[in-house]
């Protein structure tokens, strides 16, 4: 059996972890721009001190991330993001808890710090979320003990190296961009609809002389003028937002690409963690369950490949085989 870390080493920050948190910092800084602009504008319109309000808004937004790592909020977020996630039933808990305890004993970690969850899916899978959530699918519970422990050792590796914490913080700080992107898209749709309405109304006003009364003609012209103003205003707003939004969107896309690359590196790091605990051969067996399906699906290319969060199972098996220690 490989050397076991001491009980005090429940967390281990790696280069991958540092890279992930660096991306979180970048996303946080960019999110401050998205938060600051409307805060400044709203304060200016309300007659308040814009700079003070903007600073307070940015500080509140920064501090809000502390909510994400609170255990009750973490559990609620996990349920929100994974609809079929639930607490383990007594029989399931009797299956997971001893397996996790054996893995944590090898790793020198405290099994009591983790929130165990079961996902209702008919495939072998598991994931770690935030600082505490550790979930397995119902089908994963049907694995033999050594394979289930290998899956848990992999997810424990993510938690020990803080990967899920960085991912959930990055997700949280990306929310303003998601809201801003939806707003820009909505403005574009409304502007296009107004432009089409303006065109149809312009065609109709061509027949104003054909029997329409002066009052009706005047009303149509006023409506046409109003629509024209709205179309121009919407177009200007779309252009201005595009000029402001495009650099931010490009930086966010770059951050997502880098984050995906680090996520793939994190998977290899979690595999190494499991292998160092002696679960390398068992983890290879688990990954082998996905090889046939993986080979039948076309490999992603272009941006899809860059945004892929997991390396291929074949690549992971080869990496574990090259570096795995002897043992269980």
Regions found by a protein language model. Name each.
Residues 1-67:
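N-terminal low-structure segments adjacent to metalloprotease catalytic domains
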Residues 82-97, 255-273, 308-311:
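Active-site metal-coordination segments of metallo-dependent hydrolases
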Residues 156-175, 280:
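Catalytic Zn2+-binding segment of zinc metalloproteases
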């Amino acid at each position: 059996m490989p050397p076991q870390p001491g009980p005090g080493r429940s967390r281990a920050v790696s280069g991958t972890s540092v890279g992930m948190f660096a991306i979180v910092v970048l996303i946080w800084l960019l999110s401050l721009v998205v938060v600051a602009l409307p805060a400044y504008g709203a304060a200016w319109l309300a007659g308040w001190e814009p700079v003070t309000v903007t600073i307070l808004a940015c500080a509140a937004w920064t501090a809000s991330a502390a909510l994400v790592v609170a255990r009750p909020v973490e559990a609620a977020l996990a349920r929100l993001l994974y609809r079929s996630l639930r607490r383990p039933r007594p029989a399931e808990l009797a299956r997971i808890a001893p397996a996790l305890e054996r893995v944590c004993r090898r790793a020198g970690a405290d099994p009591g710090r983790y929130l165990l969850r079961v996902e209702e899916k008919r495939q072998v899978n598991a994931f770690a979320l935030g600082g505490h959530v550790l979930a397995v699918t119902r089908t994963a519970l049907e694995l033999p003990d050594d394979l289930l422990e290998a899956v848990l050792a992999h997810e424990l590796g993510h938690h020990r190296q803080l990967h899920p914490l960085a991912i959930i913080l990055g997700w949280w700080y990306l929310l303003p961009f998601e809201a801003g992107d939806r707003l820009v898209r909505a403005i574009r749709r409304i502007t296009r609809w107004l432009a089409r309405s303006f065109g149809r109304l312009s065609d109709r006003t061509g027949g104003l002389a054909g029997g329409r009364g002066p009052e009706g003609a005047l009303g149509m012209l006023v409506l046409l003028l109003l629509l024209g103003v709205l179309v121009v205003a919407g177009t200007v707003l779309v252009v201005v937002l595009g000029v402001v939004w495009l650099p931010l969107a490009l930086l966010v896309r770059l951050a997502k690409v880098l984050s995906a690359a680090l996520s793939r590196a994190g998977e290899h790091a979690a595999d190494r963690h499991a292998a160092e605990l002696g679960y390398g051969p068992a983890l290879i067996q688990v990954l082998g369950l996905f090889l046939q399906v993986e080979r039948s699906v076309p490999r992603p290319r272009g941006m899809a490949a860059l945004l892929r969060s997991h390396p291929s199972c074949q690549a992971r098996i080869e990496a574990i085989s090259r570096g795995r220690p002897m043992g269980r």
